[in-house]
Amino acid sequence: MRAVVALGSNIGDRFSYLQSAINEINQLSETQIKDISNIYETTPVGYLDQPNFLNAVITLETNFSSEELLMKLLLIELNLGRERSILNGPRTIDLDLIDFEKSILKTEKLELPHPRAFERCFVLKPWLEIDSNAEILNKGSISELIKNLNCEDIKLFPKQLLN
């Protein structure tokens, strides 16, 4: 099964948290990272009184179900010190399951595709970079969605994540 995961960090050594998340995802059984985007530095969305984020997107192949993969990602967040005290607040690591086999799902814990991905440059731009044909079900192609957004605040970060 093909999945798209967005990564973000804005506390501490942001790059190290992103790399640690990649390393932990690589340790998951029955899961293989296929592509890793460049890293982008972005301003916060929603709760604005916090540091800038580093963001990236990965695609992976997994034998887990979408719900199982989500639980694995949440455990990685916990292992890397993620706290959820402020909605959309600062975080060591954020791992969002954006798409899973182009499926539509809405449960108490998971909504696919991610309900706000289509309006977030920090998801769309790195995703498009690693999949030029990417699209969000019922929203359209990533390349078209980006045209409707102001993505000027997204800056390429000089370091690369290693798989």
Regions found by a protein language model. Give the residues of each.
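Flexible, gly/pro- and Lys/Arg-enriched active-site loops
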Residues: 35-37, 44-53, 64-70, 75-163
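Glycine-rich and small/hydrophobic secondary-structure elements
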Residues: 61
